Amino acid sequence: MSSESTKNRHRSSKRTPSPLQKERKRNWENRKSRSRSPIRRHGEKNLEYAHHNNQDNRQSSYTASKTSDQAMKTKEKTSGGTRTNPYTVFSQHRANHSNAPGWCGFYWHSTRLARNGTNNIFNEMKQKFQELQIDGKISWDTTRELLFTQKKTLDQGYRNMLYHFRHSPDCPRCDYWDDVYRKHLANVSSQESEEVTDEEMLSAVESMETNASN
């Protein structure tokens, strides 16, 4: 066989794929198609899941908000819209008893210390943070110094209270005001006790101090 005829046969085989080559090509294209389709289905499934998840989140948020609103309405209805703490009780008592002694007692001092801590956060600590912050941030060293400053202030208040109770066990003012608040607690109807928020405590104290100065 001549070399020329061999070359022509080779060219012809390259131009016209054999049945076996066609079958292999078909199988390869089918495999590629199958490998891509799960990705599309998975993507579509993920989009569907994300949409469904967003709907669930909105529904959960709405349900939580509705439950919170209902709980708040129930709480307001139960409490009758009146919430008391030692400051409000003592202020009302003094308004009706002009000869009442100066403030003192466990309930008075414990509430006063709580007020001091709240006032320290909302006023002094906030002001110091604003002075020291850079882009709304402070370093750990600065945070530590602020915390120790607050701790020193609170520690001194507790030491003063403990010193008074230790060295004045028979303080008549303590007995008087503790008795006033105990009687108030005894007369309160059997409702769930409600914790007074820091903002409410601070507001009550400021109002009380204003009345005392007048």
From Swiss-Prot:
Composition-biased stretches (Basic residues): 33-43
Biased composition (Polar residues): 56-71
Location, primary (coarse class): host cell
Span of the signal peptide: none
Pfam families: NP1-WLL (PF11733)
Biased composition (Acidic residues): 192-201
Chain spans, region Disordered: 1-85, 192-214
UniProt keyword list: Activator, Host nucleus, Transcription, Transcription regulation
Record's compositionally biased regions (Basic and acidic residues): 44-55
Family in the record: Belongs to the Bocaparvovirus Non-structural protein NP-1 family.
Role description: Required for the expression of the capsid proteins. Performs the splicing and internal polyadenylation of the viral capsid-encoding mRNA precursor, which allows its maturation and expression. Transactivates the viral promoter.
UniProt name for this protein: Non-structural protein NP-1
Species: Human bocavirus 4 (HBoV4)
Lineage: Viruses, Monodnaviria, Shotokuvirae, Cossaviricota, Quintoviricetes
